[in-house]
Amino acid sequence: MSPLTRIALALAASAALVLALTACGPAHVAGYVPKRRDYAVPDASGQDTQAASAGSTWREGRAASMLYTDARALRENDLVVVRIEEIADAKRSADTDLTRRSELNASIEAFLTSLSTPYALKGGADSGFKGLGSTARTERLTATVPAVVRKVLPNGNLFIEGHRVVLVNAEEQHFYISGVVRPIDIDQENGVKSSMVADAEIEFTGRGVLSDNQRQGWLSRLLGWFWPF
């Protein structure tokens, strides 16, 4: 076998390997492991559950039992759409004004008999401080993330968890949400607002070219740590 043939076969094998790897799914910017939240179920010892009577057509937790409402997520592995609309607006200001004044008056009259006139001693001190400070921060996050019902709590509430990964031009964005929702808060379109999610954990992170360029370099961080001014 000639050297050119060997090179051609090696290139063909490499190309086939690349195609096989890319066919398995989208390539992440770095290693990606979906987050899983270990949610501790609250103690339900004080909650009573009422069993359906014999022969009843209504069963708790069954979508078919909701005769006058649309089908909604009620059981494990059901899907529910979470509409994330988070707005944070925080402002804080402080004004400090301190003033202090002290005076001291003393006179010497008969300490020494040779003094014909008394001598007076006076002293005083003034100090003051005034400081002003203010801070403001506004954040807004809007997204739509489908979530899966991971657990059905004893009181009927649902623990949901959802991921969403978007890859555009070597920039990878990750959406994550988890929390507890009430079935009554799920609307007719099988969706719920993030403001109705209790014990919520909402994350929006990114990695890739843009995220790397926005991050300060290690040398700049090191110099900033040592520089006292």
Swiss-Prot record:
GO terms for molecular function: cytoskeletal motor activity. The keyword Membrane applies. GO terms for biological process: bacterial-type flagellum-dependent cell motility. The keyword Lipoprotein applies. The basal body constitutes a major portion of the flagellar organelle and consists of four rings (L,P,S, and M) mounted on a central rod. HAMAP family: FlgH. Belongs to the FlgH family. This is Flagellar L-ring protein.
